[in-house]
Structure formats: structure tokens, C-alpha cells
Amino acid sequence: MKHGILVAYKPKGPTSHDVVDEVRKKLKTRKVGHGGTLDPFACGVLIIGVNQGTRILEFYKDLKKVYWVKMRLGLITETFDITGEVVEERECNVTEEEIREAIFSFVGEYDQVPPAYSAKKYKGERLYKLAREGKIINLPPKRVKIFKIWDVNIEGRDVSFRVEVSPGTYIRSLCMDIGYKLGCGATAVELVRESVGPHTIEESLNVFEAAPEEIENRIIPLEKCLEWLPRVVVHQESTKMILNGSQIHLEMLKEWDGFKKGEVVRVFNEEGRLLALAEAERNSSFLETLRKHERNERVLTLRKVFNTR
């Protein structure tokens, strides 16, 4: 049984949950989940957790994402995308210079209102379910960050660009906000998620077309996941204690990367096995001071233990 992360490709049409179901069916395991919804009309990278890999999905939801999007100026739909009912069509008498200026004005932080039709929850219910029942919930705006925008291409009313965003940013809302700034509204007509953190569309796998063996072979093992997090190595004899829930004291550590208090670190044994994720109680720079004064204090607090054998 493999545990880890699969970089899946979601084609246009299926839901993110459909991708999860396909992996469950082909790998014959129930423990499968995804790390961030991708709209049915969109395609691209969908991070899938398999078995104990489902327990680290929260760390993928916090990563930057890159999208390619095409929007149509002057078209307004109830969902902010091409699948929704058309609410209004307007003339959009603006120059290319004005379009570019409006697009680039969103680089940086801004308060974004989530679309009424989205997978976001309100009192335990998905917004899109409430909207279909005629219950439109106006959520408060959320501060999001647009890190950069590039590859802007303008062909009449259709405008495409690439954008790198913070987690929780709705590209549909960004398109509509750009459209409103231009005075004509806009709707996303094509959307591709090109990357999630370090994982790109080039390495993604279409699970609907892949055989079970290929899917299994493409699972990234836990030991190679979350490589952006600091790493510590404990002495081999500490393995059993940590797997049984013992907190990590200084004497257990053999070596470590630099980390700050409050950071999550990956805990390995000398065999290279990932034992746990833990939260740092101290800055790593202070550990040598503790060692010098022979103070065997707790330095890491367990967050998740991975007993995969």
C-alpha cells in the first residue's frame, strides 16, 4: 500500500470529487482526497492525497497557484464563468492600454468577494448548493494577494493572461473585478491551473486515462513530499518512541535544518523514513545553546505521526 501525493490532471467537465472517486476506484482504497477544488469548467493541476497522504493535504492548500485564464469583456453571468446563465451583456468601449492598466492594477493585495456559486461553505453548506436553491449568500470580502500577472493577450473582447495568486483567490472573481473596473464586467471562459507550489501541469497525470499501475507508480512517497518544510533527523533508537507519541527532546536530534519557532518541520529517522510532522518550540539557532548547557528540553511538539508499516 502506497502513501503519498499524486499530481493529477483534471480535464474540463468532471468535478474535483470525480477525480478523487476515479483514484479510489482504480487503487481500491477509500482514503483519497484532494488539496483544493478546481471548478468543473476548468482544467489543470489537482493535488490528490492517497492513504496517509490525505493527512498532509492541508499544507498544499496553503501554496501559491499559477493560472492561465481567458475572460470575455462585457459578458456577465451568475457564476462569473461561461457555464452560468447570462445576466447581462454590455458594450465595452475601452482601449488595449486601458485593459492592460486595469489588469495590472490588481497586482498586490486586495479585498475579494467570493462568487456566490463556489465550493466555499457557509454554515456547513456549499455556496453553490444554496445559490441553486435561490439563497444567495453575500460573504464578506477576503484579503487575497496577486503576486504577478504576465503574458497578457488581447483579441477583441477576449483577454487572456497568466497570474500567480495566494491560496483562496478566485480567478472568476478577479476577472469580474477587472471587468467592473473597466465599466463593462467580464466572465471567465477558460481556466487552466498550471501549478500548485512546486508541482506543474507538465508532471500531472490524467487518472481517467491511466491504468491503476501507472497511477500507483506516480504517487510521490511521503518522504519526498513537503520538501519546502525544514527537516530534522532523529537517532534511530528514537523511532519507536516518536511513533508511540513521545514528544521530541533535544537529545533525540542527530541533525537539523534551520527553522524558526512555530514552524512545522519534517521528522525523519536515520533510515530516511518520515516519522512525523512537528511544530518547533524553539528557533534552531538556540539548540546549540541548550546542548552546551546540557538542557534536554522539548524542542518539537508532534502534530502528525505517520505509522505506515
Swiss-Prot record:
Domain PUA: 229-306
Isomerase in keyword set: yes
Domain of life from the UniProt record: Bacteria
Keyword line: Isomerase, tRNA processing
SUPFAM superfamilies per record: Pseudouridine synthase (SSF55120), PUA domain-like (SSF88697)
Catalysed reaction, written as an equation: uridine(55) in tRNA = pseudouridine(55) in tRNA
InterPro entries, sorted: PsdUridine_synth_cat_dom_sf, PsdUridine_synth_N, PUA, PUA-like_sf, PUA_sf, tRNA_psdUridine_synth_TruB, TruB_C
Keyword Membrane: no
GO biological process: mRNA pseudouridine synthesis; tRNA modification; tRNA pseudouridine synthesis
Transmembrane domains' residue ranges: none
UniProt-annotated catalytic positions: D39
A molecular-function term among this protein's GO annotations: pseudouridine synthase activity
The protein's Enzyme Commission number: 5.4.99.25
Family from the record: Belongs to the pseudouridine synthase TruB family. Type 1 subfamily.
Record PANTHER family: PSEUDOURIDYLATE SYNTHASE TRUB1, TRNA-PSEUDOURIDINE SYNTHASE
Function: Responsible for synthesis of pseudouridine from uracil-55 in the psi GC loop of transfer RNAs.
Protein name: tRNA pseudouridine synthase B
Species this chain originates from: Thermotoga maritima (strain ATCC 43589 / DSM 3109 / JCM 10099 / NBRC 100826 / MSB8)
Source lineage: Bacteria, Thermotogati, Thermotogota, Thermotogae, Thermotogales
